[in-house]
């Protein structure tokens, strides 16, 4: 690609392709074992300031993923004073089932919000490669990041692993 404009068009197109891939994949993946308790813990962090439901993982992804839920009047199960892992797991399942049912609309929104981190990572790959190796290498690196199966498979999950 010659010129700055062509490079930026390619970057925007590749990032759009990555976002489209994530949106496509999000609808086809079932919930992981502990994804609902991460979602519930993130929601509780925003509304109560309680970081104790899922303290073994850093809160950034949980908080970012649950931003789309802010302002909604969601049912929250009463905490029963169980061990924090049991509390988050059991209440997370109930919370998601009561508020989202089988539609998985909330899951879709939370996963896409978490996927913003992957889009940011891809842009950082582009900028770092451009700084170190030039524009052509940066576009190649961005293309590799956008179509990397590992990044695609895990980027839109609401996980902290």
For every predicted segment, state its role:
Residues 11-22:
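Hydrophobic membrane-insertion alpha-helices, especially the h-region
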Residues 20-37, 51, 73-80:
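Helix-to-loop transition at the C-terminal end of transmembrane segments
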Residues 33, 156-161:
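Short acidic/glycine- and proline-prone juxtamembrane loop motifs at membrane-interface regions
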Residues 52-113:
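Interfacial juxtamembrane loops and adjacent helix segments
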Residues 112-132:
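Transmembrane-helix motifs of polytopic, lipid-linked glycan transferases
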């Amino acid at each position: 690609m010659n010129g700055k404009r062509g490079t930026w068009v390619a970057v925007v197109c590749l990032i759009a392709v990555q976002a489209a891939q994530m949106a496509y994949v999000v609808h086809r993946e079932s919930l992981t074992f502990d994804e609902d308790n991460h979602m519930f813990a993130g929601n509780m962090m925003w509304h109560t300031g309680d970081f104790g439901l899922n303290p073994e993982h850093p809160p950034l992804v949980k908080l970012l993923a649950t931003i789309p839920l802010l302002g909604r009047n969601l049912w929250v199960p009463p905490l029963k004073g169980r061990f924090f892992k049991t509390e988050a797991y059991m209440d997370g399942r109930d919370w998601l089932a009561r508020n989202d049912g089988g539609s998985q609309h909330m899951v879709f929104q939370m996963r896409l919000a978490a996927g913003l981190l992957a889009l940011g990572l891809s842009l950082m790959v582009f900028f770092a490669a451009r700084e170190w190796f030039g524009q052509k290498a940066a576009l190649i690196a961005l293309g590799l990041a956008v179509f990397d199966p590992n990044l695609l498979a895990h980027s839109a999950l609401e996980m902290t692993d």
